[in-house]
C-alpha cells in the first residue's frame, strides 16, 4: 500500500507570480537586480514601516548578519527560546557566541519573561524572541527586561510576516529583526530572508 505525500505547506503560486519570475529571468539579471531593491522597499513599507531592509539568501543568514553587525561573538551569550527552529540557536552559535535556552510560555509557545530573567548572566548580551506561528512574543515584558539589564533584542520574525502587537509591527521592537521566505513560511519567495 502506498501513501501519497501530503506536503506540510504548499505555497499558493499563481500566474501573476509565475509571470513575474519569468520577466526577471528574461532580463538575465537574476541576482541583486532592481526587483530585489523594490522588494526590500515594498516589504518595509507594507510590513515594518520606519525600518530598513536587506534581502539575503535565508532567514538564518538574516539572523547571523544582524548578530555580527551588533558585534555579538565569542564570549557572549544570547537568550533564545527552547521551542524554535534550529536556525535561531545556530545563528548565535556560528558567531562564536553561546545560545542560552530559556523556557517558553506553554500557552503561547513564545519566550517566558520569567525564564529569560532567570537565564541572564554577566555574559548575556541579547535576547532573541521568536514570534511563532504569527503570534507575537511578549515584547513589553521582554523590552523591560532588556532595558533593565542593558541588553539588545533581536527579533526572529521568520513566521510572523504582518503580525502586530498593540498596533505595532513585529520586527520593529528590537535592535533588528529577521524574516524568512522559505516555502513553509506564511510568505515565500522560494527561499530568502530579510
Regions found by a protein language model. Give the residues of each.
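N-terminal "arm"/small-domain region of PLP-dependent enzymes with the aminotransferase-like
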Residues: 1-29, 34
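Solvent-exposed, non-membrane alpha-helical residues enriched in polar/charged side chains
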Residues: 22, 26, 40-44, 64, ...
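Phosphate-binding glycine-rich loop
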Residues: 29-77, 91-95, 100-103, 168
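Short, conserved catalytic or interaction motifs in soluble domains
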Residues: 58, 104, 132, 183-184
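PLP-dependent aminotransferase-like
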Residues: 68-157, 164
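Conserved active-site segment immediately N-terminal to the catalytic lysine
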Residues: 155-189
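Glycine-rich phosphate-binding loop of ATP-grasp-fold ATP-dependent ligases
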Residues: 190-194
